[in-house]
């Protein structure tokens, strides 16, 4: 049996509360009895879609990400609204951002991308049987949809041209599925 390294909450302070994030600062008691400060971000969670066509190409979005000041190729994703199921969020994001709907959905994995400073959870969903039904363009989002063959996407990861973490995981999942491992 492994040791219990659970930290116990002593005090908690909210430093900022916004629409998307809450910044917390907690004092905790460590297993050895000393205390420490933990700064972290609360996030209501997100869903990401791995839109996989029959020919094993993927549907990406190219968009500007303000916090890092650069454009990124990403798989469709977005926050889960309060009271919304992760699959419902994935379906909503796919149609809003790309104009596509999917006949078949499957939960692939759950990720915690930054456990050292955030509770953000991202659920990954495979979307297949894709059909274009609408025009993308959620309010306030400016992006370009790009269809890329899986082998090319793997090459973009290998050459450092796709660097967004959850997208890389989604590409690797698509490759596993193609090889019959998922």
Whereabouts are the PLM-identified features?
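Hydrophobic residues on conserved beta-strands that form the core of alpha/beta folds
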Residues: 23-25, 37, 61, 75, ...
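A glycine-rich, hydrophobic loop/mini-helix early in the fold
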Residues: 46-70, 74
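C-terminal boundary of histidine-terminating zinc-finger modules
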Residues: 171
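Extreme N-terminal tail/first-helix region
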Residues: 1-17
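Generic C-terminal helix-cap and adjacent flexible tail
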Residues: 176-182
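Unchanged
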Residues: 36, 45-48, 53, 79-165
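Conserved hydrophobic/aromatic beta-strand scaffold that supports enzyme active sites
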Residues: 20-27, 60, 124-126, 145-147
